[in-house]
Amino acid sequence: MASLDRSSHTHQINLWIALTQFEPSFSATLGELGYKCDVIEDQFYITDAEGTQIIHPDVVLTSVDAEHSLVVDCKSSKLDQEQLTRYLTLNDHEEQLIVQNVIEGVSAGMLSTEVTLSSFDDLTNQDVPAEIAVVHFDHDPYSGLAIWNPDSQEFSHVPTAHLFPVNVEPGEPLPTGYYPFDIYEADKEAMVSSILNSIISLAMKHGEYSLEEVLDQAHPYWDKIGTGKQAELLERTERIHTELLEAGLDEYVEKIAGTGGKEWGQVSATLQAIQGRTDYYVDRALDRLPQSRLDSDAWQSSTDDEDNEGNMV
């Protein structure tokens, strides 16, 4: 597998969303069958005779026309058999995706679903239940990307199965714009860069911004991301924003009084000068961030103490 500039997990989410689009470099896409992204990194509950199961898919894609959903879990090379068993409880409770507002536009009694695992690694030699489909993102630096649905773990929905394999033109970079970053260590630089660029864009266009608006602009599918993941991303964004201020952004923006540090305003007309020096500010912020994983508690940040300091607009 070729080296990646983001986490495998983040790249896979981007690829699944890209498959719902009409990417010109893809030989075929799920978008041809009407698939669209319903949710990213969310959870829902299934109650049966064994109790209540919590399921955490990475992506749910649905074709309203086909009344069929793919419930996707993005994997590395390891599988949790207990987790797979929980996913299988979905087979007799598809309507819960509609009852819990995961999916819209399909009648509860008409929806069919398929649990799907994806990975840049080959999962066909692992003990994957026959009811679960597998998609292999075969990424090679020379031949490009091929997206396989192996015969042994083929989609039961025939039109979906017939779309594969999907080939991507050699030399095309993996898509990253649909889900530009997550809370993984490999995404740290992409996260800092995206946040800074969104701050500059919003401040120059509107004169002010909130951190929620920053994330909304940075993440095209922000409204599809589960509330728990949104909270984690916001927490990291608060910390990154603090470090960008320390790196020199505070010369251009100030807190807006009465917002608890949630909203900021542009105070310098020369903010556009940062555009030519984004690498400098990103590098300075990265140097100041915790020397720990992006998904660790060391990234927790509170604006409460900061609200009593600094300048107010």
Model-found features: residue ranges?
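Nucleic-acid nuclease catalytic cores
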Residues: D92-D140
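N-terminal cationic-hydrophobic initiation segments that often serve targeting/anchoring roles
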Residues: L88-E95, L245
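Acidic-basic catalytic patches of nuclease active cores, encompassing PD-(D/E)XK
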Residues: M1-I54, S63-V64, E94-I98, D121-Q126, ...
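Conserved catalytic cores of phosphodiester-cleaving nucleases, focusing on short active-site segments
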Residues: F44-Q81, T85-T89
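Amphipathic alpha-helical segments that form well-ordered structural scaffolds
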Residues: A18, R86, R239-E243
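Short, well-ordered alpha-helical segments
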Residues: I13, Q81-T85, E235-E238
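Non-catalytic C-terminal interaction segments of nucleic acid-processing enzymes
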Residues: D121-V313
